[in-house]
């Protein structure tokens, strides 16, 4: 995926905010924590293509109540800024699902709003 300036700024902010929270409150705080990051382009007939980023953290032991509260919805300045950027500037969405040992965050944005190549390239068959 080749991002344009707006997409680069938005996803740079997203990675910074999510990594900061992982270090302070989440899976990166303790040895054995796991972080999985994936992205895909979702294309459905009759709908605009979307870029979908998933961030999944898992800690080897349950989070304490205060950390779970922060990861589960208490919004600091960085999270509010990220939300405003993804929803307001890009017309996308952010969802987060908290579990006892981690959090899953999904960011979905219109593909044509964040890429310098709005047409989806088909992979060549080998």
Language-model features: locations:
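Glycine-rich nucleotide-binding loop
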Residues: 50, 61, 99-106
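Short beta-strand patches within cytosolic ATPase/nucleotide-binding catalytic cores
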Residues: 36-38, 95-97, 106
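Glycine-rich ATP-binding loops of the HATPase_c
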Residues: 89-99
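Conserved short strand/loop->alpha-helix "switch" segment adjacent to the catalytic nucleotide/phosphoryl-transfer site
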Residues: 1-19, 23-34
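A short coil/beta-turn micro-motif at the C-terminal edge
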Residues: 29, 41-43, 98-102, 111, ...
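C-terminal end segment of the histidine kinase catalytic
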Residues: 108-126
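A short, conserved alpha-helix near the extreme C-terminus of the histidine kinase catalytic
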Residues: 79-88
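Glycine-rich/acidic phosphate-handling loop/turn and adjacent ATP-lid/helix
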Residues: 39-80
